[in-house]
């Protein structure tokens, strides 16, 4: 058999020359080319060179591949598809999604790295059928993006799509698309031709390795001859290689909501097709050489790179003759005196110089509009009485501080502006704005209203499979019962091998499109010029089809509007103190050095305090003993994965306690590391070391920081190393072993340093929340309750902590409680929103119509149904009406027939004499109905029994000698297994006297996994570790606590 080589065919005559790769490159450049056709060659004919990796003797372009970003269809990441295509010697590739460009940027990046020519397109879910189109050029891409976006937004529902009829789709394309018409379109081919014209239609022949191929392709051949249409061959691969075909099949079965076994009649018999080379296809289909050749020809017509011109930010409407830059400078100049009032003359002078420098950098980089947009968002919050503050690297900027975007003053803190915005930066800055979570939606809707729905959208978040989800969906796809799938996902039983194998393939795969926590893009023209927009699950939210990284790659400018529960809680605290105490508190006028606040934190009395309430932080506070605001900055940064993994925590604490000498590898490091006792903690310190020791500019230092990020280029690192060593020598005469030591320390430190600017911003909230906890514990607790869900602790734990601080807890009653908790006279009145099954609207009607004199009166005037009256009865909320809970439940059914407009008293019924409830029954009912108890912490009811068992209460643990074996008991509040803990699990436990820390080894967890994972309350036997005001029990045995299931609704578990 003679080899088949693709050759030029000039006007239908054979010219005797094989197609060279340079010619092929010319084809793919987008120039008009002659057709390709296969011809036979003698064995001694010159074949194309095989020196190039993956080069094939038969050029072929796969123009209808898909990836895992075609959700619940494809099995391979776009990069894997590109790598496999390169390996097989393909000359061009199209990786497309259904109704979107979800994976387009990742495909473009991978193809650019591999040197693969790209063709862009999509599958469109038209009413007439699924239409596959390729874009001929960037204009075609833009049109396709707009069509998809319009179809997605037309429905008003996430996941839905509604395209116009085919003729209108064709009119929209205006000749800038190629339609790939497969077998499913043959009965409508006349209609398709009439709409799109023959020159824009290519028949798609299938090579799916199924018996249907031959018959279907025969029909396609007849149609091709009849209408003189071009045709191509495609394997339509949903998997890059054969190894992941079962995963693709499983995904498609899930999409059909049926197990693989039942879906087999609708799926490919092998799961799916996979990518193959031109050589393989020609061997399998020797009669389709012309179709293979046409793939290259069509790729030449349609190949282009995704170098889209991203929209700019909208031009700012500046007053008078001002430019954006002059208006920004004007705003800064009018606010600088106010923001720096009370600061020293030296700080003011340095700030003025720094601001001039920053404004110069902003002007040079062309970013004044960015700052004006952020300033406008902050001003909207301020005018709307919404608490907000910028955080992250923006806190390094004096301009941001003066504008009121951030509240950390960078000059006195010694923060480096270049960490935020370097003169060498090639993209816009990144300003995160924390907004009180309960009102963030107002800010988001303001953005939509101001800039228009077409020009503003939220950034997507691609939801990927994690361990539990992968296990569940693998089990579902394989047809196992839901109960078994849940048990395997929870780890309560071992899954079979087939589930484990498939779950491993699912893990990390994209599952569906979600929404970013707060990222929004704002443009001066429709976002759909670049990427389609669709509805999000949340009401009135629209989202682009790309995540934050894809948006950044494409040049879309993102603003992060992040919801922060503590800001909402603090706003409630401010309002409560103003309402009940008559005091208006200005957070920025608080004394940040109040000793009593720091005394409280030193005792680890920080339940509910922002950022320092976790188990690890509570263990660190007594050892760090914070006395200044900067100590809080360190505390925020210290207990992070980076410093923990980098080994900074214990050396710093030892030096802090005077147990270890403060030393430096070279005296020049004292300036940058002195404030953290010679232990590097912050990313800015890495930059400052480079400036002080090696003479780097601020911009160079930021380049060093970024180069040492997660994707380290060996070439770039080598160049920076050379520059660093030369700088050490020239600036400070540092050479040899000391230079090597400094470089190695910087390289290691870069992987774990935490931004000081971030810590500075958060430390303010640490202090504010601690200040409220010390001065106004009732308002503090109620603020946290009103902002739920948030933080580390459940409402029950927060209420118990307030009780331990002497605050009276008043129960829920229909006559005294509002919808939310309140803080009258320094006490806490629990709110109706805690009553399970009541609902917000019913709670609001109760608040609006109170007081009531009977259950029928309550039911009639608050318009309650039976279930709502029963919920109130179980919660004890009608005890104030002089009716016991059992009597109230008896009356509920009849009383609920009382409705507004009816004559009162018609439903009165006398309940029989019923026994009252015991204290334990009342407690258990309260926990079940509301999740909290007002009178006491549940463990108090069984304290006598605990003492008989020799159980040590939480408040006596610090009195126990280190190394003593003991038993403790309590409600499990948390389970946490940090990645930095080598598999150890930490339990948070609580009794009526306080909190306890328990450490469970890997072996003990495995031996008693069901109990450890599921018990609501436990007895723990173990060894107490007692040092520096911190007690931890290292468990060696877990026991169930009798009736423990009644003591709590469950724990809050974290990683």
UniProtKB/Swiss-Prot annotation:
Protein localization: Cytoplasm
Pfam families documented for this protein: DNA_pol3_alpha (PF07733), DNA_pol3_finger (PF17657), HHH_6 (PF14579), PHP (PF02811), tRNA_anti-codon (PF01336)
The EC number(s) this enzyme carries: 2.7.7.7
CDD domains (alphabetical): DnaE_OBF, PHP_PolIIIA
GO molecular function list: 3'-5' exonuclease activity; DNA-directed DNA polymerase activity; nucleic acid binding
Keywords, in A-Z order: Cytoplasm, DNA damage, DNA repair, DNA replication, DNA-directed DNA polymerase, Nucleotidyltransferase, Transferase
Catalysed reactions, as listed in the record: DNA(n) + a 2'-deoxyribonucleoside 5'-triphosphate = DNA(n+1) + diphosphate
InterPro entries: DNA_pol3_alpha_NTPase_dom, DNA_pol3_finger, DnaE2, DnaE2/DnaE/PolC, DNAPol_HHH, NA-bd_OB_tRNA, PHP_dom, Pol/His_phosphatase_N
Similarity field: Belongs to the DNA polymerase type-C family. DnaE2 subfamily.
Role summary: DNA polymerase involved in damage-induced mutagenesis and translesion synthesis (TLS). It is not the major replicative DNA polymerase.
Name of this protein: Error-prone DNA polymerase
Organism in which the protein naturally occurs: Corynebacterium glutamicum (strain ATCC 13032 / DSM 20300 / JCM 1318 / BCRC 11384 / CCUG 27702 / LMG 3730 / NBRC 12168 / NCIMB 10025 / NRRL B-2784 / 534)
Gene: dnaE2
């Amino acid at each position: 058999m003679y080899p088949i080589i693709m050759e030029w065919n000039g006007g239908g005559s054979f010219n005797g020359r094989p197609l060279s790769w340079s010619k092929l490159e010319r084809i793919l450049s987008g120039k008009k080319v002659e057709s390709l056709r296969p011809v036979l060659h003698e064995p001694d004919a010159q074949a194309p060179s095989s020196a190039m990796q993956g080069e094939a003797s038969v050029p072929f372009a796969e123009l209808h591949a898909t990836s895992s970003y075609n959700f619940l269809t494809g099995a391979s990441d776009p990069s894997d598809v590109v790598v496999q295509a390169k390996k097989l010697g393909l000359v061009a590739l199209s990786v497309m999604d259904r109704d979107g460009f979800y994976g387009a940027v990742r495909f473009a990046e991978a193809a650019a790295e591999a040197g693969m020519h790209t063709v862009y397109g999509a599958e469109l879910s038209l009413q007439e059928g699924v239409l596959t189109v390729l874009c001929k050029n960037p204009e075609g891409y833009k049109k396709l993006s707009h069509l998809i976006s319009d179809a997605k937004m037309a429905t008003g529902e996430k996941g839905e799509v509604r395209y116009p009829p085919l003729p209108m789709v064709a009119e929209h394309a205006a000749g800038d698309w190629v339609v790939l018409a497969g077998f499913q379109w043959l009965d409508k081919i006349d209609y398709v031709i009439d709409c799109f014209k023959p020159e824009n239609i290519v028949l798609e022949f299938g090579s799916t390795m199924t018996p249907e191929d031959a018959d279907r392709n025969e029909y396609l051949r007849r149609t091709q001859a009849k209408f003189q249409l071009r045709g191509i061959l495609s394997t339509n691969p949903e998997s890059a290689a054969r190894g992941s075909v079962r995963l693709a099949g499983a995904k498609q079965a899930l999409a059909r909501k049926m197990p693989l076994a039942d879906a087999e009649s609708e799926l490919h018999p092998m799961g799916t097709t996979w990518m193959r080379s031109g050589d393989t296809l020609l061997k399998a289909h020797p009669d389709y050489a012309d179709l293979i050749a046409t793939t290259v020809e069509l790729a030449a017509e349609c190949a282009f790179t995704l170098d889209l011109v991203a929209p700019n930010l909208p031009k700012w409407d500046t007053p008078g003759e001002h430019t954006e830059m002059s208006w920004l400078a004007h705003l800064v100049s009018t606010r600088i005196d106010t923001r720096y009032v009370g600061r020293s003359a030296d700080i003011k002078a340095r700030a003025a110089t720094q601001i001039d420098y920053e404004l110069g950098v902003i002007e040079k980089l062309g970013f004044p509009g960015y700052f004006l947009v952020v300033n406008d968002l902050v001003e909207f919050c301020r005018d709307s009485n919404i608490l907000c503050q910028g955080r992250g690297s923006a806190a390094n900027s004096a301009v941001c501080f003066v504008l009121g975007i951030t509240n950390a003053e960078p000059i006195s803190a010694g923060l480096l502006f270049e960490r935020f915005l370097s003169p060498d930066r090639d993209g816009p800055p990144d300003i995160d704005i924390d907004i009180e979570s309960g009102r963030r939606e107002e800010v988001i809707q303001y953005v939509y209203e101001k800039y228009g729905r077409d020009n503003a959208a939220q950034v997507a978040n691609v939801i990927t499979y994690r361990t539990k989800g992968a296990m569940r969906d693998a089990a579902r796809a394989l047809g196992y019962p839901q109960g078994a799938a849940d048990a395997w996902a929870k780890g309560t039983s071992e899954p079979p091998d087939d589930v484990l194998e498939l779950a491993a393939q699912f893990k990390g795969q994209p599952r569906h499109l979600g929404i970013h926590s707060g990222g929004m893009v704002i443009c001066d023209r429709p976002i759909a010029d670049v990427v389609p927009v669709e509805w999000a699950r949340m009401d009135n939210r629209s989202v682009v089809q790309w995540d934050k990284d894809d948006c950044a790659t494409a040049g879309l400018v993102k603003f992060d509007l992040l919801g922060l529960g503590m800001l909402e809680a603090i706003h409630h605290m401010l309002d409560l103190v103003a309402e009940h105490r008559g005091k208006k508190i200005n957070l920025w006028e608080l004394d940040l050095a109040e000793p009593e606040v720091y005394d409280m934190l030193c005792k680890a009395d920080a339940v509910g305090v922002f950022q320092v309430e976790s188990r690890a932080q509570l263990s660190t506070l007594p050892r760090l003993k914070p006395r200044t605001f900067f100590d809080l900055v360190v505390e925020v940064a210290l207990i992070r994965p980076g410093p923990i993994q980098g080994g900074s925590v214990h050396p710093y604490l030892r030096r802090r306690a005077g147990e270890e000498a403060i030393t430096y590898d070279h005296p020049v490091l004292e300036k940058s590391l002195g404030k953290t006792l010679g232990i590097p903690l912050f990313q800015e310190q890495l930059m400052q070391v480079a400036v002080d020791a090696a003479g780097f500019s601020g911009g160079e230092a930021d380049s060093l920081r970024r180069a040492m990020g997660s994707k380290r280029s060996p070439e770039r690192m080598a160049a920076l190393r050379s520059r660093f060593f030369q700088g050490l020598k020239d600036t400070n005469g540092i050479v040899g072993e000391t230079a090597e030591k400094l470089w190695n320390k910087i390289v290691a430190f870069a992987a774990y340093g935490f931004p000081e600017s971030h810590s500075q911003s958060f430390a303010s909230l640490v202090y504010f929340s601690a200040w409220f906890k010390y001065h106004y514990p009732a308002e503090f607790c109620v603020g946290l309750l009103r902002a739920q869900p948030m933080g580390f602790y459940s409402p029950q734990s927060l209420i118990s902590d307030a009780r331990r601080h002497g605050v009276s807890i008043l129960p829920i009653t229909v006559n005294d409680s509002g919808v939310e908790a309140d803080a009258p006279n320094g006490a806490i009145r629990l709110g109706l929103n805690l009553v399970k099954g009541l609902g917000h609207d019913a709670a609001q009607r109760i608040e609006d119509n109170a007081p009531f004199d009977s259950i029928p009166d309550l039911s009639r005037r608050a318009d309650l149904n039976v279930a709502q009256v029963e919920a109130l009865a179980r919660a004890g909320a009608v005890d104030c009406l002089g009716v016991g809970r059992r009597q109230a439940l008896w009356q509920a059914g009849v009383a609920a027939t009382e409705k507004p407009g009816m004559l009162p008293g018609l439903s009165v019924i006398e309940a029989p004499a019923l026994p009252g409830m015991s204290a334990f029954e009342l407690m258990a009912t309260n926990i079940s109905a509301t999740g909290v108890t007002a009178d006491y912490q549940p463990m108090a009811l069984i304290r006598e029994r605990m003492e008989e068992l020799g159980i040590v209460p939480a408040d006596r643990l610090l009195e126990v000698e280190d190394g003593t074996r003991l038993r403790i008991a309590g409600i499990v509040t948390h389970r946490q297994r940090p990645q930095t803990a080598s598999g150890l699990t930490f339990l948070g436990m609580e009794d009526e006297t306080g909190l306890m820390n328990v450490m469970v080894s890997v072996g003990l967890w495995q031996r008693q996994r069901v109990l450890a994972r599921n018990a609501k309350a436990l007895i723990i036997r173990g060894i107490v570790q007692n040092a520096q005001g911190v007690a931890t029990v290292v468990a060696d045995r877990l026991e169930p606590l009798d009736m423990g299931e009644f003591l709590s609704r469950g724990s809050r578990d974290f990683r």
